[in-house]
């Protein structure tokens, strides 16, 4: 809700029509119409839609979790009932976005807990639901959303330095994961 409230005046200023709480049932690309589960339809010029997230079929086939998601302790990041099995990223059933940043912050907690379990026999950190998301707003401007289980997104006014930070961060990230930095 916080993001939708924040984005509405920005979209209006840029002449972008949007609709929230619209669950896509089907897209008719020939007539450029999208129909909802709720029985409404909307014409479009450019449709930007996020497909439903789906869990892994192998998880469901092996009885590890409903819908393909592994039941995960939201703080320990372990499979429910198995404290020696860590779960990260898109495989979890956590109430956080399935994004690279969420997986990154989860992985940091898991790595520290594996190391501390080896060294002192117990995990030392809990995951707080932290997610960081850049939001490009056009015209070389950007902002970000950072939130966790306790704090909703607190979006700032878009600005050019944030756009360039995002651009630089992406280049640095991919350079580092390829081992070039």
Role assignments for model-derived ranges:
Residues 1-69:
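A Rossmann-like FAD-binding core segment of flavoenzymes
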Residues 41-108, 112-116:
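FAD-site-proximal beta/loop scaffold in flavoenzymes
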Residues 1-9, 13, 17-19, 99-116, ...:
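Rossmann-like dinucleotide-binding core of oxidoreductases
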Residues 144-181:
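C-terminal auxiliary extensions adjacent to catalytic cores
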Residues 32-34, 86, 142:
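Hydrophobic residues embedded in beta-strands of well-ordered beta-sheets
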Residues 115-157:
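Active-site-proximal substrate-binding core of FAD-dependent oxidoreductases
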Residues 24-27, 77, 135:
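A structural signal for short hydrophobic beta-strand segments in well-ordered beta-sheet cores
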Residues 30, 66, 81, 129-131:
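A generic structural signal for well-ordered coil/turn residues at beta-strand boundaries
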